[in-house]
């Protein structure tokens, strides 16, 4: 049925390895618990494919399945193509009715983002001022529903770009490369903490620094994540090795309870303050 509420839409394919799959469903459940607390009026949409097994009891309101004839192994070998094609199909569906935030599975939502939607942008992105990284991180993308044809064209172009890349980038990073390419691969090394409004190809962008809307905990000299309180960012993104701190942060800092329970999706029962 069509969505009647703002939504968080999370793309995730079930990994072929059973242990890894369970771990990522645990991440999903932790992420969902933070959304239920900070954004109780929002829906949670899982974006996946027809080859993915979705566990019973997963905390989501809608499961959107993009049709595939490939094996799951083949899908993971072209994961970025699978992702952006799923985005493309989702935003062409009747589930896209209200303000929507595309999110990765490995993040915690600390603040309601929907007051950011003021009708003045079509796509909202988060940029980094670190020149060693891709200009944009695709873990948080804001999508306004006011101009659906513009949104559809945007994701068509993202798909076209990703499919033009070689196998390495079709498997990883191609989404971020395409997003940056559509803005001519900008350099924001001196831009932070500015919030930037920009128009290109009839599409209105709003760009937030990652430290405000898509923050990752710092790494030490040995590239190990540093556990620390980060209360200001709207979203905490536990990329890479930081994933090992996600449950700890939810429990110790955000006050959630987590109990191992093999009978629930992800193997952890997550509860806490509302």
Where are these regions (language model features)?
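N-terminal anchoring/stem segment of glycosyltransferases
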Residues: 1-75, 95-96, 145, 149, ...
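A structural signal for well-ordered alpha-helical segments within the folded catalytic domains
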Residues: 26-29, 33, 81, 85, ...
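A residue-level signal for conserved active-site and pocket-lining positions in enzyme catalytic cores
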Residues: 35, 87, 106, 141, ...
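Short, polar loop motifs at secondary-structure junctions
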Residues: 47-54, 107-114, 240-241
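Short loop/helix-cap segments at secondary-structure boundaries that form the rim of catalytic
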Residues: 51-59, 114-119, 247-248
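Charged, often glycine-rich, active-site loop that binds/positions anionic groups
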Residues: 57-78, 204-222
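GT-A fold catalytic core of metal-dependent nucleotide-sugar glycosyltransferases
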Residues: 65, 79-136, 140-145
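Catalytic core and acceptor-binding pocket of nucleotide-sugar-dependent glycosyltransferases
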Residues: 149-258
């Amino acid at each position: 049925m069509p969505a009647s509420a703002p939504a968080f839409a999370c793309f995730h394919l079930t990994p072929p390895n059973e242990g890894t799959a369970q771990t990522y469903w645990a991440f999903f459940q932790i992420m969902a618990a933070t959304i239920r607390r900070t954004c109780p009026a929002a829906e949670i949409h899982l974006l996946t494919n027809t080859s993915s097994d979705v566990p019973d009891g997963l905390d989501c309101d809608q499961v959107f399945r993009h049709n595939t004839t490939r094996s799951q192994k083949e899908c993971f070998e072209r994961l970025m193509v699978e992702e952006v094609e799923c985005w493309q199909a989702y935003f062409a569906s009747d589930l896209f009715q209200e303000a929507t935030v595309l999110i990765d599975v490995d993040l915690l939502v600390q603040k309601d983002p929907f007051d950011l939607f003021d009708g003045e942008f079509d796509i909202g992105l988060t940029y980094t001022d670190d020149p060693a990284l891709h200009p944009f991180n695709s873990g948080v993308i804001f999508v306004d529903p006011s101009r659906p044809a513009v949104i559809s064209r945007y994701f068509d172009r993202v798909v076209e770009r990703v499919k033009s890349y070689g196998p390495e980038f079709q498997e990883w990073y191609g989404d971020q490369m395409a997003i940056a390419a559509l803005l001519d691969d900008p350099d924001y090394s001196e831009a932070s903490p500015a919030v930037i409004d920009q128009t290109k190809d009839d599409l209105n962008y709003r760009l937030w620094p990652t430290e405000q809307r898509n923050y990752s905990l710092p790494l030490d000299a040995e590239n190990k994540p540093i556990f620390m309180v980060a209360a200001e960012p709207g979203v905490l993104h536990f990329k890479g090795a930081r994933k090992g701190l996600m449950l700890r942060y939810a429990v110790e800092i955000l006050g959630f309870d987590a109990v191992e329970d093999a009978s629930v999706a992800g193997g952890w029962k997550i509860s806490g303050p509302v």
